[in-house]
UniProtKB/Swiss-Prot annotation:
<keyword id="KW-0793">Thylakoid</keyword>
<keyword id="KW-0472">Membrane</keyword>
<keyword id="KW-0150">Chloroplast</keyword>
<keyword id="KW-0674">Reaction center</keyword>
<comment type="subunit">
    <text>PSII is composed of 1 copy each of membrane proteins PsbA, PsbB, PsbC, PsbD, PsbE, PsbF, PsbH, PsbI, PsbJ, PsbK, PsbL, PsbM, PsbT, PsbX, PsbY, PsbZ, Psb30/Ycf12, at least 3 peripheral proteins of the oxygen-evolving complex and a large number of cofactors. It forms dimeric complexes.</text>
</comment>
<protein>
    <recommendedName>
        <fullName>Photosystem II reaction center protein M</fullName>
    </recommendedName>
</protein>
<keyword id="KW-0934">Plastid</keyword>
<dbReference type="InterPro" id="IPR007826">
    <property type="entry name" value="PSII_PsbM"/>
</dbReference>
<keyword id="KW-0604">Photosystem II</keyword>
<comment type="similarity">
    <text>Belongs to the PsbM family.</text>
</comment>
<dbReference type="Pfam" id="PF05151">
    <property type="entry name" value="PsbM"/>
</dbReference>
<feature type="transmembrane region" description="Helical">
    <location>
        <begin position="5"/>
        <end position="25"/>
    </location>
</feature>
<keyword id="KW-1133">Transmembrane helix</keyword>
<dbReference type="GO" id="GO:0009535">
    <property type="term" value="C:chloroplast thylakoid membrane"/>
</dbReference>
<comment type="function">
    <text>One of the components of the core complex of photosystem II (PSII). PSII is a light-driven water:plastoquinone oxidoreductase that uses light energy to abstract electrons from H(2)O, generating O(2) and a proton gradient subsequently used for ATP formation. It consists of a core antenna complex that captures photons, and an electron transfer chain that converts photonic excitation into a charge separation. This subunit is found at the monomer-monomer interface.</text>
</comment>
<dbReference type="GO" id="GO:0019684">
    <property type="term" value="P:photosynthesis, light reaction"/>
</dbReference>
<dbReference type="InterPro" id="IPR037269">
    <property type="entry name" value="PSII_PsbM_sf"/>
</dbReference>
Length: 34
C-alpha cells in the first residue's frame, strides 16, 4: 500500500508540475496580449 501511495504522489507531481508551468506561461501570454 505504501508503495502505491508513493507512486500516486510521484505521478501526481509528474502531471501537476508541467501543468502548472504551462498555466504560468499561458497567463503571462494573455497578460501581454492585453
Amino acid at each position: 500500500m505504501e508503495v502505491n501511495i508513493l507512486a500516486f504522489i510521484a505521478t501526481a507531481l509528474f502531471i501537476l508540475v508541467p501543468t502548472a508551468f504551462l498555466l504560468i506561461i499561458y497567463v503571462k501570454t494573455v497578460s501581454q496580449n492585453d
